[in-house]
Design a protein with these regions (language model features):
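Non-cytosolic coordination micro-motifs
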Residues: 21-55, 88-159
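Acidic-and-aromatic substrate-binding clefts and catalytic sites of carbohydrate-active enzymes
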Residues: 59-63
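Mid-chain, structured segments of secreted extracytoplasmic proteins
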Residues: 64-100
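C-terminal motif of bacterial Sec signal peptides marking the signal peptidase cleavage site
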Residues: 13-16
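Sec-dependent N-terminal signal peptides
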Residues: 6-9
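Positively charged n-region of N-terminal signal peptides that target proteins for export
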Residues: 1-4
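Intrinsically disordered, low-complexity boundary segments flanking structured domains
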Residues: 11, 71-72, 123-124
């Protein structure tokens, strides 16, 4: 009897610890960071602020020579509203392949099927509803092949 009670307590503790909510993040950076902390973290990762493309009161755009994408962070006061990664690649096929790979990787990571409101050859959208935010993978091969990954944190629930 004593062993059964200890086993049940251990299982309860294991379940409680494993269901701990992970913060919604962009490439390992929690979106609960303040705007200034996020900017500093991006700078330490080798990104520079593109002041010509940024709006000092609402958005900050980051660029780096080391990667083929730009990152836009939208904010209000010191709170991050969204982070968007935009890839510009040379061919439609490369963006299609990348869209499919990102979609498959997120499906495995989140253990969820995406909502796909648009699934055409050159325009695809996959929305993943994570517990603490929405991740959208968007393909737009119209004038220039463009792939966008958007992270939007959900508002905290009020008790």
């Amino acid at each position: 009897m004593k062993k059964t009670v200890l086993f049940l307590m251990a299982m309860t503790l294991l379940v409680a610890c494993s269901s701990e909510e992970k913060p919604f993040n962009y490439r390992g950076l929690p979106l609960a960071l303040s705007t200034s902390q996020f900017v500093d973290s991006m700078k330490t990762r080798g990104f520079a602020v593109d002041s010509a493309a940024s709006d000092s009161g609402r958005t900050v755009v980051f660029a780096s020579e080391a990667v083929k994408y730009r990152v836009l962070m939208a904010f209000e006061d010191e709170k991050i509203k969204a982070v968007q990664e935009t890839w510009r690649l040379s061919t439609n096929d490369s963006t299609r392949q990348m869209w499919q790979q990102l979609r498959d990787d997120l499906e495995k990571e989140l253990g969820a099927w995406p909502n796909c409101p648009m699934l055409k050859d050159d325009h695809k959208v996959a929305d993943f509803d994570a517990e603490t935010g929405i991740i959208s993978v968007i393909l737009e091969n119209t004038y220039k092949p463009t792939l966008t990954v958007r992270y939007i944190p959900k508002s905290p629930r009020t008790p």
